[in-house]
């Protein structure tokens, strides 16, 4: 593999905190919660009735109305975030570069809302009521496909699908595509609209989600003694990645370098984290080796931090295992305390927050952390953002099936 370095030049996000980077980042640094009562279906019969919904989003702002009808909501979010990231990068796509620009954008559960809607039409009226756009509107790889159709990019175009590690793997493999020489620019990340009735119902049946329905803003509380499960969130997080010399040649503004990527498997349990965080620890170690950085270099770690009793402790143990004594000197926070858990889009949003931490010198807080739970004894940047200039940031994403993904970003 040639020594092709990869940098981040564009960021785009749709989240429960806002429908662009400025509003979302403002919410993050000010410790605002985007969690509220579920509003787009009647959740009265569900154990969990709260989520981080995307609000005041109009897909027609990003795609023609006639085309928007052919896309599930997760595609709307992903297309919008992709177009924002392209604009933020100042990237002009033309016949001269289109074949060298690709998209690797995934989703954890994809078009589940569309599947529900079309199933209802079938049950009410039979097969003739099923939309001819049902399949292409719900399959996950149609998201990068729509980005290609809208922008004209002709490079590698596909999706990673690995539950809540989807975006970490998408971004990491997009970096590899550039390093391998298969592309000069990749649009990468994930999108999700998971707050649908069957999705919420499924997670409720697993007893995986918080039931703090009377206080939604305080429901997502990673590492806190009173944490009782995660809170679903919707949205998309997309990065524009470029080969360093290509970015320099076109005069691009460079946020930072994407220096390392790790991917491992627990081989332990369908949904529970591995004991003592063994799998995630190997993943972090792999990413650091790839970036050629020592544990002592990690200044900030955007954790997976879902607010589940088992998961938060396991990740704390994994961080200690991977970073050794330096774990206690590393600022660790979970922005899921504010956004909720965006599932397949989580790693994209959190990669953006990691990049912004390097770029702005502001470390995102973990809100709702009033009293750390047993064994949770790291510096979780509780409740208030912190001014701190760091050179290296790490971002974790772990998913059902025991799949892990870690990214390492470095200031240039």
Predicted regions mapped to residue ranges:
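Short glycine/threonine-rich loop-to-helix capping motif typified by GTGT followed
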Residues: 268-277, 306-323, 342-349
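Conserved catalytic cysteine-centered active-site region
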Residues: 1-3, 37-80, 100, 110-173, ...
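Conserved small-residue
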Residues: 10, 28, 82, 103, ...
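Glycine-/small-residue-rich "gating" segment that lines the acyl/pantetheine channel
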Residues: 124-131, 172, 176, 192-249, ...
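Flexible, low-complexity linker/loop segments at domain and module junctions
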Residues: 1-8, 95-98, 291-297, 328, ...
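Condensing-enzyme catalytic core mediating Claisen C-C bond formation in acyl metabolism
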Residues: 5-9, 36, 214-291, 300
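Short, well-ordered amphipathic alpha-helical segments that serve as non-catalytic structural scaffolds
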Residues: 78-89, 143, 170, 242-244, ...
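ACP-dependent fatty acid/polyketide chain-elongation machinery
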Residues: 1-67, 89, 245-255, 352-366, ...
